[in-house]
Amino acid sequence: MKAQILDEATAEFADAIARYESIEPGLGIRLKQEVRAAVEWIAEHAELPRARPKGYRRVNLKVFPYYVAYMIWDGTIWVLAIAHAARRPEYWIGRRPGAD
């Protein structure tokens, strides 16, 4: 399945990369690589993570305290957020494809 990332998620992800790069050069790049690997895994195995009661699925990153929240809609994977696991739980829950 093809994965699309909502504009809001892309902007937040860019902020996270910049924040990690400011902490240590190269750290933001490692975050980007880990998220890319997670999205590729999701594209191959989208239905493996169970759907949560609110209709989304989530894959935790292995190194960074982030997760990729997504939903499958109309045959496409929509990444709703690349969210920090300990900050603002489900702040992105109202996001939907086409609502950008």
Identify the residue ranges that each predicted region occupies.
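Basic/aromatic recognition patch in beta-strand/loop cores that engages polyanionic ligands
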Residues: 37, 44-77
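Short, charge-rich, low-complexity interaction segments located
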Residues: 22-24, 45-54, 87-92
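Arg/Lys-rich, positively charged N-terminal/basic patches that mediate binding to nucleic acids
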Residues: 1-32
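Short, well-structured alpha-helical segments
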Residues: 32, 36-39
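Enriched for short, Lys/Arg-rich terminal
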Residues: 29, 67, 71-100
